[in-house]
Each structure stands twice: as C-alpha cells, then as structure tokens.
C-alpha cells in the first residue's frame, strides 16, 4: 500500500464529529473506558479516554499531552502510563476485517459514548516518520474526547484504541478506492501495534539499571 502523505493532514485526531455516536450510560462495554486528563502545564485543560493494559499500566493516545504517570510514548499514537487496575483486566486480541466493532469513550462533556460499525480491511498510515505504523479502520462514528478509549469486538475483547476520524470530504481528498463509498471512517491503533510498542517499552526498561522489566507484567489475551 502506498504511503498516504495527505492522510495526516486530512485525518482529525478526534477533534471533530464523525457521524453521531450514542450515549451509553449502563452498557457494560463502557466499564472498560475511563477519563484521563492532561497534566501540568496544561493541567485538566485537555481530556481523553483510556483503557487498562495490565495490572499496573493503562494506555491512551500520545496526542493527549502531559498525562500524569506517562512512562513511554510509542512510535504510533500511543502512550503507556502508570494506573493501577481497579477491576478485571480486559481481554485483548487482533481485530478481524468484517467483524462488528464498538468504539467506546467519553465526549467533551464527560458523557459516556459509543459508536458501532464494521471493521474494514483497509489499513492507513498517519505519519510517514513513525516507522511504518499501520492503523485499522472501521465505519462507526466517534467524537472528540473518545480518543484513547477502547475499540471492542462483539465478544467483549479490546482490539485497539480510538485515534482519529475521516469525514466524507477527507475520504474524497485522499482518493482511496478501498475507503470510497463511506460517509465517515474512524481510525484506531490495533492491538498488534500496541503490543509491539509495549515490547519496545519492555526492552527499553530492561536496559535501565534497577528498573523492573515490565514485560513480565501480564496482559489478558484470548489470542
């Protein structure tokens, strides 16, 4: 697949509307997402969503700055930050094209939101300088604030985190045949890419004297 130099400019890092997700007050799927804020010097000025990764770390997007407890920012739009699990860990796995997905998170008014769609086979790149990180796509809606929240499969597994969205005008401008015909597209970082970033973090930590290697911290997975 050819690099999409225009995709970064066209994509919106969940700073605009992509269809209309619905509020989800009592849906069990919403329990996996929680709100995270920017820290100093922008304390509480910016917000996003996050999901637990293992007993000691949670994961959100890198474009949310100054997250308290952040210890590693990956090549892709992802960062790991210290956050103790307070409930059962989610199961993680790779997504499957064609399966039903639900994007979960919170909007700018702190209301729980979710948008349902179908996983597409199309993969995209957001930045030619990120080492070739590939992002998944689905046709469900997302809104500002959901960035970093989990993307769930029908079996309850987390298959990635919300990152960005593309409007119909964006899709027309990039001229991707495999994305044509959609009113909007949401972009997420798949589990496989998140796991690769975690392994890079583990390798980095293993070379720091006196710092425990986080690779031994388990994550729940059904793969």
Question: Which sequence ranges carry the predicted segments?
Answer:
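C-terminal motif of bacterial Sec signal peptides marking the signal peptidase cleavage site
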Residues: 14-16
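Sec-dependent signal peptide recognition
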Residues: 2-10
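A conserved glycine-rich beta-strand in the N-terminal activation segment of trypsin-fold
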Residues: 30-61, 67-73, 148
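Mid-chain, structured segments of secreted extracytoplasmic proteins
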Residues: 66-91
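Terminal peptide-recognition signature
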Residues: 56, 60, 81, 98, ...
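C-terminal cap/linker of serine protease catalytic domains
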Residues: 19-25, 86-89, 163-223
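Flexible, gly/ser-rich surface segments that form the specificity/activation loops bordering the active-site cleft
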Residues: 88-147, 162-174
């Amino acid at each position: 697949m050819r690099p999409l130099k225009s995709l970064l400019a066209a994509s919106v890092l969940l700073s605009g509307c992509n269809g209309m997700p619905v509020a989800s007050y009592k849906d069990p799927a919403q329990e996996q997402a929680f709100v995270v804020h920017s820290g100093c010097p922008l304390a509480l000025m910016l917000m996003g969503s996050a999901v637990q990764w293992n007993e000691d770390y949670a994961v959100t997007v890198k474009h949310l700055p100054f997250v308290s407890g952040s210890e590693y920012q990956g090549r892709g739009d992802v960062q790991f930050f210290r956050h103790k699990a307070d409930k059962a860990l989610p199961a993680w796995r790779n997504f499957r094209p064609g399966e039903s997905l639900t994007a979960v998170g919170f909007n700018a008014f702190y209301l729980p939101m979710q948008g349902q769609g179908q996983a597409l086979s199309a993969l995209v790149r957001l930045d030619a300088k990120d080492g070739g990180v590939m992002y998944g796509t689905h046709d469900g809606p997302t809104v500002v604030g959901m960035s970093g929240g989990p993307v769930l499969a029908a079996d309850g597994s987390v298959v990635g985190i919300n990152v960005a969205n593309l409007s119909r005008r964006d899709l027309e401008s990039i001229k991707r045949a495999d994305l044509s015909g959609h009113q909007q597209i949401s972009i997420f970082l798949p589990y496989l890419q998140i796991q690769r970033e975690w392994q890079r973090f583990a390798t980095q930590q293993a070379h720091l004297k006196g710092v425990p290697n986080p690779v031994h911290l388990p994550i729940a997975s059904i793969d």
